Amino acid sequence: MDLGKFEKKEYFVNRELSWLKFDERVLSEARDKNLPLFDRLKFLSITASNLDEFFMVRVASLKDQVHAGYHKTDIAGMTAKEQLKEISVRTHELVHVQYNTLNRSLIPALEKAGMHLVAAHENLTEAQSAFVDRYFEDNVYPVLTPMAMDSSRPFPLIRNKTLNIGALISKKEKSDKLNKKDKAGELLFATVQVPSVLPRVVQIPSKKDGDTTVILLEEIIERNIDKLFLSYDVICAHPYRIMRNADLTIDEDEAEDLLVEIQRQLKKRQWGEVIRLEVEDKMDERLLKILKTEFDIKEADVFEINGPLDLTMLMKVYGADGFDAYKTPRYQPAPVPEFQNEKDIFQVIREGDVFLHHPYMSFDPVVNFVRQAAKDPDVLAIKQTLYRVSGNSPIIAALAQAAENGKQVSVLVELKARFDEENNIVWAKKLEKAGCHVIYGLVGLKTHSKITLVVRREETGIRRYVHLATGNYNDSTAKLYTDCGIFTCDERFGEDATAVFNMLSGYSEPKSWNKLIVAPIWMKDRFLSLIEREAENAKKGLPALIRAKMNSLCDPKIIAGLYYASSCGVQVELLVRGICCLKVGVPGISENIHAVSYTHLRAHET
């Protein structure tokens, strides 16, 4: 299969720009007036959370490339500097649409629904003002730490993603002698962090019975900010927020202890290079100039925002009581028929493979599989991979119990699961303390497979039970994300699962596989061979179809292979959740390819 002619840069979409298109699709859900109002709030919050991570990881990585003098182009022919320039334009446009959606569509609709968001503390009634001031004195003031900047106090370190209020203050003519060096009328900079330990969305009395009124914590602080600087006049005060480079740089070959090295790098995450500054669009120019200078940030990375900073807080508004009529009813996963009224999960699996489709089917059988294995006296060993788990994970508890019950328990905990590193370090230590053998995977690779192997002693001998799945062993997100899994005791899967764990924990590399296709060594070649098979079928006039679901499609060889298949007449149907670097509809190249966005499940059919 000669793919050379299909690997030209004009046939590919830049990875980062494709991701921004994905976030735009999520934003389109927030703009869709056919959806329940509070669902739209949730989607808008998700777009903001997505954009935060995009800047902290992807934009940060591109800036690192520019700083390092890296000039090579990506598969779409763009340098890092060119990508950053285009990203700045696109993200400013996206943020503009976010706030237009909030201000022109969502807030008016919320008002009609009886939910009032006080945009400015100046709009409070007398009764609301009294409540807010009392709330400040009782709950907020004791937590605040105002910090000034002068010759003896340098600009303070501002943590990543924190919301802060910057102020320009001027010493009063008649004041105490605390700051003798400050001249009356001279402008000074001060800042105070909006405490993340306090609720950002605060409910206050409503004008009308039955309505709900909320105000943001930063508005409460702004209203009372003069109480933090008693000897000074507050000239202006405005919120701001920064985003820092949060991508971990770990040399796994040099690291003597991966867990310790990741812990060390995590401490640096809060203090990486500032890559984005968000401010109110009405911020005093003198204050803005100070922030841009101190953070050493370019104009292209400043976002002047018409509304509250950090829209992830809308998830708190979504959670307000009394508005169920404006939300999609919570879906209740259906019980898995094979496991109903059955206490012995192993007997069910022996009777036949069981396919699970989450969240439509309950995740309980997966949890119960590990729980029963932990208690079953005939179970000799449990092996499992963990990427992301819930905060109070029943899976972790069951694995710890299994080890305490004397079973051989081996767990691969992926320490490099982005933004779950700290959680996974905690779980790894807990499992080790319980007696589990904890491993961290292969150097230079993330282990993203979801696999559990239970080795059980039975009358006929040793039998291996396997659970394979997409997604995570996370009982919370399993109620939200679309994933699939299978239970089996087919010995071919058992042999393959054993080989996977031996490869992860030691130096064993299987020569062949019975049923599994494992990345990164074997999967790409297998997919390319399947693509070529369909292309040959099309050439012979035989039925030829490729239908695939995936998280992202970025690999240039796979994309070129799909172009080749399309040019041979193969119908290609792609469901791609996020990034898609493939261009559809290119004459002679991808005319037979149809690609749409979708949810989390990954599957491949040829």
Roles of regions detected by a PLM:
Residues 2-378, 396, 564-566, 578:
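N-terminal non-catalytic structural scaffold regions of very large proteins
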Residues 3, 107-121, 126, 147, ...:
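PLD/PLD-like phosphodiesterase catalytic module centered on the HKD motif
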Residues 12, 16, 77, 92-96, ...:
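Hydrophobic alpha-helical scaffolding
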Residues 26, 43, 599-606:
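Conserved small/polar residues in nucleotide/adenosyl-binding loops
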Residues 213-229, 240-242, 453-528:
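Signature of lipid phosphatidyltransferase scaffolds
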Residues 361-365, 369-376, 388, 401, ...:
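Conserved helix-loop functional segments at active or binding sites
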Residues 390-397, 557:
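Active-site core of PLP-dependent enzymes with the aminotransferase class I/II
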